[in-house]
């Protein structure tokens, strides 16, 4: 994973875990890699993964069972709520960017309605829209 130098690494790992849950890469109830294994995979210190896991647990998206491991929550309602919030933020940023270019809300709506859809390969489309 490439990291953005302007954002703490643990925050980027939290976002990756959230996105993997939202796009189904990590299934409900699935066991996450151990802190040590995830640190090796992500090429970071174990303390960074530990913090990311703890923050994910605080967000309610994973649960840790002492001596067993960390697991994706099985609360579909919460996952749906997080997905809706993610979509809202993407749309809000999209509108903000177009307004910064001088488009009105009505013009933005017309652009969305009249822009031909871009076809992405299925495997890429889920990843691109959850970043």
Regions found by a protein language model. Name each.
Residues 1-31, 37, 85, 89, ...:
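Extreme N-terminal segment that seeds HTH/winged-HTH DNA-binding domains in transcriptional regulators
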Residues 10, 34, 68-85:
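Short, cationic-aromatic polyanion-contact patches
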Residues 13-15, 48-51, 62-63, 80, ...:
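Short alpha-helical segments used as structural interaction elements across diverse proteins
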Residues 25-26, 30, 58-67, 71-74:
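Beta-hairpin "wing" of winged helix-turn-helix
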Residues 31-63:
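N-terminal helix-turn-helix
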Residues 41, 58-61, 76, 101, ...:
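Residue cluster at the C-terminal edge of the helix-turn-helix DNA-binding motif
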Residues 76, 94-95:
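Short amphipathic alpha-helical interaction patches enriched in hydrophobic/aromatic residues
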């Amino acid at each position: 994973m490439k990291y953005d130098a302007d954002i703490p690494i643990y925050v980027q790992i939290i976002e990756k875990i959230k996105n993997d849950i939202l796009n189904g890469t990590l299934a409900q109830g699935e066991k996450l890699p151990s802190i040590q294994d995830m640190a090796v995979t992500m090429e970071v210190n174990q303390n960074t993964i530990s913090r990311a896991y703890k923050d994910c647990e605080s967000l309610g998206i994973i649960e840790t069972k002492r001596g067993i491991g960390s697991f994706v929550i099985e609360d579909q309602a919460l996952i749906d709520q997080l997905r809706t919030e993610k979509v809202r933020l993407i749309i809000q940023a999209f509108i903000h960017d177009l307004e910064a270019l001088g488009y009105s809300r009505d013009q933005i709506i017309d652009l969305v309605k009249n822009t031909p859809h871009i076809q992405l390969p299925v495997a890429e489309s889920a990843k691109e829209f959850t970043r």
